[in-house]
Amino acid sequence: MFLSLIIPVYNVERYIDKTLKSILSQNAFPFTYEVIVVNDGTPDHSMEIVERYRYNFDNLTIINQENQGLSCARNSGLKIAKGDYVWFIDSDDSIPQDAFESLFPYLTRYRHEVLAFDITKIEEETGKKLTEKIFLKPKYYHLYNTSHNGTELNKKIHTGIVQRFIFCKSFLSRYHLTFTPGIIHEDIDFIVRILLHANSILPIAKPCYNYLLRSTGSIMSSLNIKSCTDRIKIIKLWNKIESEEHLSKMQTAVIEDNIFNICYGLLISSSGNVSSYEQFLRQNRNYIIRRGLTAALYSIFSYFSLGKVAKTSYLLINLLEK
């Protein structure tokens, strides 16, 4: 079996039909892929829709569990996945009609550890579509369709959406790569750890995923205090990796660069709940600034840019003002 698609389900009765239809109507033999739906204790009618599909498709499996959150649901699906590759799909998104046709040649002929591709962002209210390249800037487009080490792609590709990647399952198993339970920003944490270990990432110049921008917003659409505290947790998780694993200088640079980005982002963030945000800063400001400066000094030598120098100066000024 080439591919396992893992779909956590929670409160998506408006969307899950389109998601499953987009997958199960692909031009591919059923034995070449499986769909694993993880019912994360959804209280709505989503699973009634899923059950109708299971009746007609033998390659659809359902896992039922109490609500544990997105990371745990993905991990549950990963545990039973039979495919050589795994693709984490959100239950309000979809894939293009030719997605399998575009991706399967890479899954069957080559043994890349990770496939990365462009996505189409779709506004729910207007239906407006925008293609977002996997690369951050046009100057990196020449890197399409050639294999790269993960550390080479840091600062060159988008890392905030895990759905735009397909992973070799044996690669994930080898490095014990799973999602960290209970945190927001689990995708960033996961992808950074992917970049640390992957020796073969293939960027594909093709939009293979439809990412829905929901009009009701999402956890990520506004800053909240959990978002802030979870970013501190991620920094400490990465600190642990640095202390426990024998990382190369470039692997350490990947972590330090992303720690710097988190620290800088926390200081320039704004929040609807001003008092809670100010309390968070009072408790964590010195740690954020000092850790950010340490990360900046390390990563500047690896990824020098005037922008990073300017941001580092901002952190230093904040520290001196105390």
Question: Where on the chain are the PLM-derived regions?
Answer:
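Catalytic core of nucleotide-sugar-dependent glycosyltransferases
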Residues: K206-S215, S221-K249, I262-Y287
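A conserved acidic beta->alpha catalytic loop
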Residues: S22, N39-E48, E66
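Membrane-interface aromatic/basic loop that binds lipid-linked glycans or pyrophosphate carriers
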Residues: S271-K322
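Glycine-rich, basic loop-to-helix element that forms the pyrophosphate-binding segment
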Residues: Q65-A81, S91, S102
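Donor-binding/catalytic cores of nucleotide-activated saccharide
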Residues: L70, S91-L202, Y211-L223
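Short, well-formed alpha-helical segments that are part of the catalytic scaffolds
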Residues: V12-Q26
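Short aromatic/hydrophobic "clamp" motif used to bind/position activated sugar donors
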Residues: V86
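Cell-envelope/extracellular polymer assembly enzymes that use nucleotide-activated donors
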Residues: F2-S4, E34, D189
